[in-house]
Amino acid sequence: MSQLVYFSSSSENTQRFIERLGLPAVRIPLNERERIQVDEPYILIVPSYGGGGTAGAVPRQVIRFLNDEHNRALLRGVIASGNRNFGEAYGRAGDVIARKCSVPWLYRFELMGTQSDIENVRKGVTEFWQRQPQNA
């Protein structure tokens, strides 16, 4: 199975979700000066920012990470967290990234996610990678 790459703000909601998920994952640094580069296909897990608009929905650190052509080329899908209080903008970062990078938006969960979200993502990620060509 390939990896997960995620970003978590200082609230650590996404970090706690990843810990509960228990799958291999690499964190995009909170410090904008630090960079990472991935070397295998991955699914991105990202929180949504802002009050509901498209502008500002994707964290700057994630934009910087995806602006690296090498990292962007290995992206295979996106999972987004958000807050249902934002209505239609709930999980908007997933929609933005999926459209701009032409990858599927696989799932969204609220804040730290529920146990059901954990189980759905574990199962969905496993099934997603099983459907992918070996050299994808």
UniProtKB/Swiss-Prot annotation:
<comment type="function">
    <text>Probably involved in ribonucleotide reductase function.</text>
</comment>
<dbReference type="InterPro" id="IPR020852">
    <property type="entry name" value="RNR_Ib_NrdI_bac"/>
</dbReference>
<dbReference type="InterPro" id="IPR029039">
    <property type="entry name" value="Flavoprotein-like_sf"/>
</dbReference>
<dbReference type="GO" id="GO:0036211">
    <property type="term" value="P:protein modification process"/>
</dbReference>
<protein>
    <recommendedName>
        <fullName>Protein NrdI</fullName>
    </recommendedName>
</protein>
<comment type="similarity">
    <text>Belongs to the NrdI family.</text>
</comment>
<dbReference type="GO" id="GO:0010181">
    <property type="term" value="F:FMN binding"/>
</dbReference>
<dbReference type="InterPro" id="IPR004465">
    <property type="entry name" value="RNR_NrdI"/>
</dbReference>
<dbReference type="Pfam" id="PF07972">
    <property type="entry name" value="Flavodoxin_NdrI"/>
</dbReference>
